Amino acid sequence: MAKTLSKPASGALAPWLGISLIVILFDQLSKIAILKTFVYGAQHELTSFFNLVLVYNRGAAFGFLSTAGGWQRWAFTALGIAATLVICFLLKRHGQQRLFSLSLAMILGGALGNVIDRLVYGHVIDFLDFHLGAWHFPAFNLADSAITVGAVLLIYDELRRVRGSR
């Protein structure tokens, strides 16, 4: 069977790493734009439910461990690097499984986008702020979005696989 761009050969890492690189690029460019446009804590209302803000997250998702004293920067950086190694192994091994690999590529790009922030700035830059009245969902960024979409696709792929085996 001829190899095509639509279906990478088993073990073909390049297409999936390319997707991860695109995620990283969009994530980092968006953060640079926010850093050049906003001062810390600034907020710009775009709609009745969405603002652009500039906040720093020294913790994990939803600010978990953000006040832990500094060790979490290196712990989450190490976790991101470990996840990178595991994901690259899985992509190498299962590169022919398109949805599975796409989900991992998105998670990888998002994880590395946030690792770059931790290494360069000492914290993750968040700027997307959705709210309903006075209640605000924790601010997040494009890397977080890619991780979330990747995780949802991963769950969907697994459910599809389980249903297909019945």
Curated annotation (Swiss-Prot):
GO biological process terms held by the UniProt record: proteolysis
Residues forming the catalytic site: D126, D144
Enzyme Commission number: 3.4.23.36
Cellular component annotations (GO), alphabetically ordered: plasma membrane
Pfam families recorded: Peptidase_A8 (PF01252)
Domain of life: Bacteria
Enzyme class: hydrolase
Listed transmembrane segments: 9-29, 49-69, 71-91, 100-120, 135-155
Keyword field: Aspartyl protease, Cell inner membrane, Cell membrane, Hydrolase, Membrane, Protease, Transmembrane, Transmembrane helix
Broad class of where this protein is predominantly found: membrane
One MF term in the entry's GO annotations: aspartic-type endopeptidase activity
Membrane topology designation: Multi-pass membrane protein
Recorded catalytic activity of this chain's protein: Release of signal peptides from bacterial membrane prolipoproteins. Hydrolyzes -Xaa-Yaa-Zaa-|-(S,diacylglyceryl)Cys-, in which Xaa is hydrophobic (preferably Leu), and Yaa (Ala or Ser) and Zaa (Gly or Ala) have small, neutral side chains
Subcellular location field: Cell inner membrane
Matches recorded under PROSITE patterns: SPASE_II
NCBIfam families: lspA
Function: This protein specifically catalyzes the removal of signal peptides from prolipoproteins.
Protein name per Swiss-Prot or TrEMBL: Lipoprotein signal peptidase
Organism the protein comes from: Burkholderia lata (strain ATCC 17760 / DSM 23089 / LMG 22485 / NCIMB 9086 / R18194 / 383)
High-level lineage: Bacteria, Pseudomonadati, Pseudomonadota, Betaproteobacteria, Burkholderiales
